[in-house]
């Protein structure tokens, strides 16, 4: 799994449910959190624990792009690993376009 591939396959056509399914297939519920985090890091994300909720690891991948062949923007994929004990209990993913 690579976020660049997920963006190519699903991002531009706004198929978030399909992207969520691809990430969920790579990170099954019950997987050890360190293993899930390692997969996301290899996929290109940067991960850190959320300060307010230490049972959640938030991983962010960003990619620079242009809009209308001129305007700079960042595509940002955020994946949150919700842990229960040392295992993945839930995964949430979102995509945002940050226009400059």
Give the positions of each predicted feature.
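Active-site rim elements
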Residues: 23
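Soluble non-cytosolic domains of exported or imported proteins
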Residues: 13, 17, 26-34
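Membrane-helix boundary/juxtamembrane interface motif
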Residues: 11-14, 87-100
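Short amphipathic alpha-helical surface micro-motifs
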Residues: 8, 28-29, 40-42
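Short, exposed beta-strand-loop hairpins at the edges of beta-sheets
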Residues: 78-87
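Compositionally biased P/S/T/G-rich terminal and signal peptide-adjacent segments
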Residues: 1-18
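A cross-family detector of function-defining hotspots
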Residues: 33, 37-78, 94-100
